[in-house]
Amino acid sequence: MKKVLVFAAFIVLFSFSFLSTGLTAQAALKDGTYSVDYTVIQGDSDSASMANDYFDKPATVTVNGGKSTVSLQVNHSKWITGLWVEGNAVSVTSKNASSDTRKVSFPVSTLSNPVNAKIKVDIDDDDLNYHHEYQIKLRFDEGSAKALAGAVKSSDNNTTTPATKSDSSNKVTNPKSSDSSQMFLYGIIFVATGAGLILLKRRAIFK
């Protein structure tokens, strides 16, 4: 009986690993421009960094040919004197001295996993003198992606098609082929589980 339970537990864990992989693959964004929520977390943990408050949300993500470029706004711009993402300095696209903000952009290799970054803070105030560099990570929430500019490019012919209301307020619809693959995977898992349980029961009977 213990062998049956162990086998069943293994199948369940194995199934979840495959399903999570499939969901990650389906979450990939088509070519287009999106608003995406994100959190600045500490470099060595999943906890929010103090720097999180210095980055305005959401970010704007442009996907072109499968490559993603992120644009976001930094507040307290005078304090944030340096920002590097995946080892490269970000590009400053605009500054606003009156609001003490600046917009930056940078390419990222992935949106599915936290992106390594480094920040440099220099504060020279009467009440505070602080100079430090430290590691952070940018954790993007692909599930929050909303299409912007009223259009999403088709990956088939690279043309731009109007986005429907559902595109602008919900996740990007997954292709039907992915749904079929998912159902096929469910079938394999179900058959394998049933066959394994029957085999183990037969062995138990003949012992």
Swiss-Prot record:
This protein's UniProt keywords: Cell wall, Ion transport, Iron, Iron transport, Peptidoglycan-anchor, Secreted, Signal, Transport
Topology versus the membrane: Peptidoglycan-anchor
Alphabetical list of SMART domains matching this protein: NEAT (SM00725)
Motif (NPKXZ sorting signal): 174-178
Database matches in CDD domains: NEAT
Protein's UniProt keywords contain Signal: yes
Region of interest (Disordered), ranges: 151-178
Primary location class: secreted
InterPro entries found in the cross-reference section: Haem_uptake_protein_IsdC (IPR019909), IsdA (IPR050436), NEAT_dom (IPR006635), NEAT_dom_sf (IPR037250), Sortase_SrtB_target (IPR017502)
A molecular function GO annotation: hemoglobin binding
Residues carrying Murein peptidoglycan amidated serine: 177
S-S bonds: none
One Pfam family recorded for the sequence: NEAT
Ranges for domain NEAT: 29-148
Prosegment residue ranges: 178-207
Induction data: Present in both exponential and stationary phase (at protein level).
Polar residues: compositionally biased ranges: 154-178
GO cellular component terms, semicolon-separated: extracellular region; peptidoglycan-based cell wall
Gene3D superfamilies cross-referenced by the UniProt entry: 2.60.40.1850
NCBIfam families referenced in this protein's UniProt entry, alphabetically: IsdC, srtB_target
Name of the protein in question: Hemin/hemoglobin-binding protein 1
Gene source species: Listeria monocytogenes serovar 1/2a (strain ATCC BAA-679 / EGD-e)
